[in-house]
C-alpha cells in the first residue's frame, strides 16, 4: 500500500514539475543553427569561419573519419583561406569525460578560438563537452550534467554531421560517459547549440549499411518520442517531428539499400536535423533513458539500442500514444486496411507500430536487446529513472517497479529470441 502511495505521489510530482518546465520552455530564447546544405556544402565552411573573424580552429573528429579521408576537402579549403587548425581525433563511440578533458587541454594549449565538430553524434557531443568545460573551467563534467548548468557562452561550434541520426548539430544536449562509473548522462544548455550546421550528403555516401540503419532509426526515435511527449512542444516542434518522420518513411530504407543515392542521403540528413531540433525542446523519453543506461553500461552503439527499444516502449505506453501515432500514420500516408472501413486511432497507431517493427527487420536490427545481464537490471533502472523523471514529459510515467518490469520483459524477449535461433 505504501509503495502504491509513493508511486502516485511521484507521478503527480513529475507532472507538476513538467507543468512548470512547460512555462519555462515557452519563455526561453530558442534558436536554430544557420544551415549550409547540398552536395559540396562542406567546401563553403572555411569561408564562413573566416568571415566571422576566427583564426585558429580545433577540428574535433574521430580516427576513422580522418583515416577515410573525409576531412581532405575541408582541410584543403582551410589552407586556401589561410585558416590555422589543430585536429583532435581521440574520441570513442561513446565519448567520455576523459576525452573531453583531453580536448580542453588541446583547445587551450593551442589557443584555438572556435571548433569544427566533424563527425557523428559522438564527435559533436564531445565538442560540446569541450566547449562547456572551457566556459566553466572550475566545474567537472559531472557537475554540468542536467539542465542549464553551463549558462555561459561557449566557443562557437560549426557542426558537420557525417551520419544522419543524432541530430546533435541542432540540439542543446551533449551525452558524456563517466569513465569510472560507466554512467552516461546529458548536459543540456542553450549555450551548447552549434552556430552552423553543414548538411553535405556526400559525406554520408560511404557509411556502411549497418551504420545508416542505426543512425536513421535514432533520428526516428527522436522524432517519435518528441511528438508523443508533446507537453513542451510548440507548433514548430510538431512540424519538425512531422517532417522528420515523413522523410525517414520515404528515404531510410533507400539510403540503406543504395548508399550512393544522394537524394535519400540528403533527406536523411534533413530528417536528423529536424528531429534534433524538435527534441531539443520537445524532449525524449524512456527509449532514451533506458537506452542510455544500456549503451553506457555495455559500450554498444547508441543508435542500435534506440532502434531496438523504440517500438517496444511505444507499445508499452498503450492507449496514451494512440492519437499521436495515428497522426504519424496519416502524415506518412500509410495504407490502413479495416474490414468495416472504420479507421480508429488505435488501428492507425497499430499500422505505424507495425511499420516500425517491419523496418527494423528489413534493416537487420534485432528485435530485443541481447546485451542485458540480469544482475544489471536494477542499475539500468536506477540510471534511467534518474535521467527521465521528473524531466521527460513522457505520455505515461513509470515508477521504478514498472520500469523494471519493462526491462525484464526485454531480457526475457532476448532469451526467447536467442533460443529460437539456436533451435
Regions found by a protein language model. Give the residues of each.
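An N-terminal, well-structured beta->alpha segment
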Residues: 1-87, 417-423
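C-terminal catalytic subdomain
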Residues: 282-353, 357
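N-terminal small/polar loop signature for handling phosphorylated ligands or for N-terminal nucleophile
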Residues: 66-138, 254-265
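C-terminal charged capping/lid subdomain of soluble metabolic enzymes
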Residues: 2-14, 329-423
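Glycine/threonine-rich beta-strand-loop-alpha-helix active-site module
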Residues: 98-202
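Short glycine/serine/threonine-rich phosphate/pyrophosphate-binding segments
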Residues: 42-45, 67-70, 97-98, 122-127, ...
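Carboxylate- and glycine-rich phosphate/diphosphate-binding segment that chelates Mg2+/Mn2+
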Residues: 173-282
Amino acid at each position: 500500500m505504501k509503495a502504491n502511495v509513493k508511486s502516485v505521489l511521484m507521478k503527480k510530482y513529475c507532472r507538476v514539475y513538467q507543468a512548470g518546465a512547460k512555462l519555462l520552455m515557452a519563455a526561453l530564447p530558442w534558436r536554430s543553427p544557420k544551415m549550409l546544405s547540398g552536395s559540396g556544402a562542406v567546401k563553403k565552411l572555411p569561408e564562413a569561419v573566416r568571415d566571422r573573424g576566427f583564426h585558429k580552429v580545433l577540428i574535433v573528429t574521430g580516427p576513422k573519419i580522418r583515416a577515410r579521408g573525409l576531412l581532405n576537402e575541408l582541410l584543403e579549403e582551410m589552407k586556401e583561406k589561410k585558416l590555422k587548425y589543430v585536429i583532435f581525433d581521440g574520441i570513442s563511440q561513446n565519448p567520455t569525460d576523459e576525452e573531453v578533458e583531453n580536448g580542453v587541454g588541446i583547445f587551450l594549449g593551442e589557443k584555438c578560438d572556435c571548433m569544427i565538430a566533424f563527425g557523428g553524434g559522438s564527435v559533436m557531443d564531445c565538442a560540446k563537452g569541450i566547449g562547456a568545460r572551457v566556459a566553466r573551467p572550475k566545474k567537472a563534467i559531472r557537475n554540468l550534467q542536467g539542465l542549464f548548468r553551463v549558462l555561459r557562452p561557449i566557443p562557437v561550434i560549426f557542426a558537420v554531421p557525417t551520419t544522419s541520426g543524432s541530430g546533435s548539430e541542432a540540439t542543446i544536449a551533449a551525452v558524456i560517459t563517466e569513465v569510472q562509473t560507466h554512467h552516461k548522462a546529458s548536459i543540456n544548455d542553450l549555450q551548447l547549440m552549434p552556430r552552423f550546421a553543414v548538411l553535405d550528403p556526400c559525406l554520408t555516401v560511404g557509411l556502411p549499411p549497418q551504420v545508416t540503419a542505426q543512425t536513421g532509426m535514432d533520428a526516428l526515435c527522436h522524432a517519435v518520442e518528441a511528438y508523443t511527449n508533446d507537453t513542451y512542444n510548440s507548433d514548430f516542434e510538431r512540424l519538425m517531428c512531422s517532417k522528420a518522420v515523413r522523410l525517414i518513411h520515404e528515404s531510410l530504407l533507400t539510403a540503406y539499400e543504395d548508399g550512393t543515392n544522394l537524394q535519400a542521403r540528403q533527406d536523411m540528413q534533413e530528417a536528423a536535423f529536424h528531429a534534433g531540433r524538435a527534441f531539443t525542446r520537445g524532449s525524449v523519453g524512456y527509449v532514451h533513458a533506458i537506452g542510455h543506461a544500456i549503451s553506457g553500461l555495455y559500450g554498444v552503439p547508441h543508435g542500435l539500442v534506440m532502434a531496438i527499444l523504440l517500438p517496444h516502449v511505444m507499445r508499452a505506453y498503450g492507449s496514451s500514444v494512440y492519437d499521436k501515432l495515428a497522426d504519424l500514420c496519416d502524415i506518412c500516408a500509410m495504407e490502413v486496411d479495416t474490414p468495416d472501413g472504420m479507421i480508429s486511432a488505435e488501428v492507425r497507431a497499430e499500422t505505424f507500430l507495425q511499420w516500425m517493427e517491419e523496418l527494423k527487420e528489413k534493416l537487420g536490427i534485432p528485435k530485443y536487446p541481447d546485451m542485458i545481464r540480469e544482475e544489471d537490471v536494477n542499475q539500468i533502472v536506477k540510471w534511467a529513472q534518474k535521467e527521465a523523471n521528473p524531466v521527460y514529459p513522457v505520455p505515461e510515467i513509470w515508477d521504478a517497479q514498472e520500469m523494471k518490469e519493462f526491462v525484464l520483459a526485454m531480457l526475457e524477449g532476448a532469451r526467447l529470441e536467442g533460443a529460437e535461433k539456436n533451435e
